[in-house]
Structures are given as structure tokens and as C-alpha cells.
């Protein structure tokens, strides 16, 4: 009797590791945003270190215009509240993560009340710090822009000068085989990026720095 051979699922970490054109730190090469998370809890100490990393991000005039709301599965009601701030498509997979966070940005400088044009940029820097710290601890972070800002404002009493801008699912990567087919395919697809020649210019818009000899 012949036994059917089941297809094997490639290890996401192997598939997802970047193939950079030039050397980069391994934390950047190994970082990626999974859709699948295990139910393993994130320790309080690890979670604290992630937000400590965010704390030390650079920002314009040291304004630090970011605020985060965080919820873990240890507090089901809080977790459900934060989950409800995501669009339906993101709720479907993010609900498996052990930790969810909401990134809020303040659009005004605290002292002058003037618009802070760097605010969203700086929130991104804080979250990037968090992501790299998470990667160093064997954790993964999937950032989302698909959320419901008005829902978040109401549930968390976010003031008028601030806005829920992004959400983060944090945890340990799960085997992609346990995901719905469409998400499994995404978790198993190689990471792709435009070459630097397409976004690093010199002299004028569209003039590649690599072609001009500024970069290799």
C-alpha cells in the first residue's frame, strides 16, 4: 500500500530572511511581520524592554509625540477592547497574538501648540526601535495601519490633538501551516524590496545615486 506524501511547509524564518545587496545587521535581515502567532505569552520583562526601546527613540526637539496602549491575553476584556479598534480583516488574524498595542501620535508640540510635522515620522521611529528590540528577543511584531481611529478615540478617550495611527501585534511566530490559505501564502512568500537605485537619488529627482557612483 502506498502512503501519500504530504507537502512540507518551509520554515518561515528561512523563507523570510532578507538577501541584502550589501551587509546589514542580522536583526534587520531576520525581522519580518508574521500573520501567525503561537499562544505563548510574552513575559512582563520582555514587554517592558520593548517599550523601553521605544522610549529611547529619537524625535524632533525630543518631543516624543508617541503614546501606546497595550493589552495582553491576561486581561481578556482589555484585549477585546483593543482588538475592536482594528478593521475586521486584521481582527481575524491579530486575535491570535498574545499582545496587542495601539500607537497614538500627538500632532501638536506640547509647549507651543504648533503643528508637529515630524510627529508621525517619530512614532515610526519609536515603533522601529520596539520592533528591533523584539527581534533581538526572538519575538515578532506585525504593524498595521488598518484600524478604526474614531473607535479608538471613543474607547480610550484620546484627546483632539492626538490620533490612533497604527496597531501592533506582538508574540512568537507560529507555523504558517496553521493559517488560512491566503495568509499562509503570505507568511511563506520571500520578502521583496526595491533596489536602492530606485529610491536613493542624487542631483535631481530620479537620478540614481548608484548610477552616479555615490553608492555601489
What are these regions (language model features)?
Residues 1-216:
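Acidic, surface-exposed loops and disordered segments
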